[in-house]
């Protein structure tokens, strides 16, 4: 069975069977995807996280299919209907749809019209009709009039019910319909009478009809959401006449009276059984495809957001802006610890701008503030303007930071545990400041679904979504690595091989014993075994460790290689890291071994060049157009700076400094054809856009990047 799985996955993914086998062996041995991708390149042939995850997903699906086959075989055997040919066919089938078609005639059913007819003894009559040789079926039917069968017509009706069920369970018939649905099925949506006003936001779909195979995922999910809310009635249908004709060609072999009875049964089978069944199947398949696309977009957006550039360890002031309630101000040290908080009221209706400036000046001096993070919610632009009009004694950079999800964090158990004496406004301002310092460390504390970069996220398969987002967070955290001595338990949870319990044990050990001085010391943490250490060690950094390799992505299992390199050059490891000329003398091929190949050696040399390097780029200061405050200030043709706030499969939304985000449709991202917006833009990217259209009533803004100078 294992080899069959390897062959099938290799064929699907275009990856060699050897790579599949080695990867599955590592996964089954408890290795994580980030660990395999980073430290087992020789075994996998250099597969990345996406490929390894795909192997894992297909393997899990095949295992599920294997379990389903076992259930089907057992059920048919219990009925005493299993034959060697049938069992062989089930065992050789791995397509879920085909498997269910094979099983359908044997599947236990609630009482059907066909079953009721069989109990009346009408199956022999159905067989006579299907042979289509009897010239007078009514006369033959008269012989079945007894008991609950009232007359010949009643007998024929029961026989047709049996035939209809046989037609609906026929594999060839089902495949005929599937092929027709696949080619020509049309998705139709119509508004439910009386729901026009309530469902106004769905008015684009009130009377729409389009090819199912061409319907984009965002449209399909919007239509399905409206259907769930009772606003739309939705159907999927091919050409009914063509479908019936195809079925009749298969089952009706005579123009006589029996043939007409069979034709009537075929029409009933299509309308009552087959069409609803295949429609349900296609509805589920199209929904699954749309879910997968939406989840892919969400995961990519989340990845870009988590890997946004950090300001780093600077002393930051966080401001959660507001009008009537004032602006909540917090001051943090370079490690993100809260030092001070208070309110200022620079805006209407209070208008205490002088007092606000004096307070800010005092805080900036007292806490040696180096940067200010302003939340991008209510009063954000006004607060930014107020700050930029002031002259502080210290040079401070001003940044606008997304507040999305900050309110969720501020009311969370994590925030309450850290700041039990402070209210949600203080916690929210702290989150804004920390997002500027290190977006990854801060955002992992928030449910990804609350961050606001998804597309119909509440409508997709929630277990699939959670799995994908959790894996995305894990990949990002391990790509960057974390400081073992400052990382929160929540951040450590996502490190390869740890999880919640070991993460908390590390934090507890740190609290009791002080900072870790080496990676080896991890083995003293309760419940830290050799396997967990192997999986996590390379992703944990100790900046001031005695061994400089403890602050790199070089795995402890490879320290001996670096030590040998240093020894061969007559220097220490620290000197090797510090001296580029020494590193240039290294001949990597000298250190090849049966377990260490060039991929690992190249990674080691890259780490020695930039120890503990952060893959995230440097942060950039950004300013919105000062003349644009509301949607009413926009004019067609106006060019504006903006920040990409969300990406969907139909385009990108851009924050241009007002309440409403504008949309750059896929066709307006570039002169060339673009199939995926991620080819052109990324989350939080700074862009210049031109206004194409403004709908003030519907609060919609159309943007373009074509013909606009790139930032």
Q: What does each of the following model-derived ranges do?
A:
Residues 75, 89, 99-103, 226-239, ...:
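Structured, non-catalytic alpha/beta "coupling" segments that mediate domain-domain communication
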């Amino acid at each position: 069975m294992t080899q069959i799985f390897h062959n099938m996955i290799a064929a699907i993914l275009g990856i060699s069977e050897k790579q599949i086998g080695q990867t599955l062996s590592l996964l089954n041995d408890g290795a994580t995807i980030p660990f395999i991708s980073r430290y087992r390149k020789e075994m996998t042939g250099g597969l990345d996280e996406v490929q390894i995850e795909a192997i894992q997903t297909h393997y899990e699906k095949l295992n599920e299919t294997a379990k389903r086959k076992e259930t089907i075989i057992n059920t048919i055997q219990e009925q005493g209907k299993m034959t060697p040919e049938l069992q062989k066919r089930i065992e050789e089938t791995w397509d879920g749809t085909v498997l269910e078609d094979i099983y359908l005639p044997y599947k236990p059913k609630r009482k059907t019209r066909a079953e009721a007819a069989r109990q009346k003894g009408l199956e022999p009559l159905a067989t006579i009709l299907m042979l289509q040789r009897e010239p007078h079926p009514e006369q033959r039917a008269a012989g079945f009039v007894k008991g609950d069968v009232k007359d010949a017509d009643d007998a024929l009706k029961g026989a047709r019910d049996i035939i209809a069920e046989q037609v609906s369970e026929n594999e060839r018939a089902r495949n005929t319909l599937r092929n027709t649905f696949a080619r020509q099925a049309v998705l139709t949506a119509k508004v439910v009478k009386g729901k026009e006003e309530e469902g106004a936001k769905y008015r684009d779909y009130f009377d729409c009809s389009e090819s199912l195979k061409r319907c984009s995922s965002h449209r399909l999910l919007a239509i399905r959401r409206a259907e769930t809310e009772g606003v739309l009635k939705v159907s999927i249908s091919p050409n009914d006449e063509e479908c019936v004709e195809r079925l009749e060609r298969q089952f009706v072999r005579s123009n006589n009276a029996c043939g007409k009875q069979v034709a009537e049964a075929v029409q009933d089978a299509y309308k009552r059984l087959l069409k609803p069944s295949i429609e349900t199947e296609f509805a589920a398949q199209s929904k699954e495809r749309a879910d997968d696309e939406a989840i892919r977009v969400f995961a990519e957006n989340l990845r870009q957001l988590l890997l946004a550039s950090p300001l780093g360890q600077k002393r930051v002031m966080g401001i959660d802006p507001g009008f009537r309630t004032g602006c909540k101000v917090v001051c943090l040290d370079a490690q993100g610890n809260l030092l001070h908080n208070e309110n200022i009221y620079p805006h209407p209706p209070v208008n205490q701008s002088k007092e606000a400036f004096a307070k800010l000046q005092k805080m900036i001096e007292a806490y040696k503030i180096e940067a200010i993070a302003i939340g991008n919610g209510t009063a954000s632009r006004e607060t930014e303007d107020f700050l930029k009009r002031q002259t502080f004694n210290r040079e401070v950079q001003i940044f606008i930071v997304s507040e999305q999800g900050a309110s969720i964090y501020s009311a969370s158990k994590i925030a309450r545990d850290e700041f039990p004496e402070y209210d949600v406004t203080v916690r929210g301002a702290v989150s804004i400041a920390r997002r500027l310092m290190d977006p990854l460390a801060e955002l992992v504390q928030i449910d990804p679904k609350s961050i606001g970069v998804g597309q119909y996220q509440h409508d997709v398969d929630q277990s699939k979504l959670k799995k994908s987002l959790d894996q995305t967070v894990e990949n990002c955290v391990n790509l960057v690595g974390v400081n073992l001595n400052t990382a929160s338990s929540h951040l450590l949870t996502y490190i390869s091989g740890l999880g919640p319990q070991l993460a908390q044990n590390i934090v507890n050990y740190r609290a009791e014993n002080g900072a870790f001085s080496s990676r080896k010391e991890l083995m003293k943490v309760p419940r830290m075994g050799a396997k967990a250490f192997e999986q996590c060690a390379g992703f944990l950094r100790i900046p001031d460790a005695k061994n400089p390799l403890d602050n790199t992505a070089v795995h402890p299992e490879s320290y001996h290689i670096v030590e040998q390199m240093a020894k061969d050059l007559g220097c220490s490891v620290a000197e090797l890291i510090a001296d580029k000329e020494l590193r240039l003398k290294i001949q990597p091929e000298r250190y090849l071994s049966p377990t260490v190949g060039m991929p690992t050696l190249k990674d080691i040399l890259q780490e020695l060049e930039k120890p503990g390097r952060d893959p995230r780029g440097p942060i950039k200061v950004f300013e919105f157009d000062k003349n644009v405050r509301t949607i009413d200030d926009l004019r067609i043709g106006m060019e504006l700076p903006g920040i990409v706030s969300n990406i969907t499969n139909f385009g990108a939304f851009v924050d241009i400094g007002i309440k409403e985000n504008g949309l750059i449709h896929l066709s307006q991202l570039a002169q060339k054809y673009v199939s995926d917006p991620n080819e052109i833009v990324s989350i939080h990217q700074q862009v210049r856009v031109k206004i194409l259209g403004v709908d003030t009533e519907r609060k919609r803004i159309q943007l373009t990047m074509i013909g606009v100078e790139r930032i």
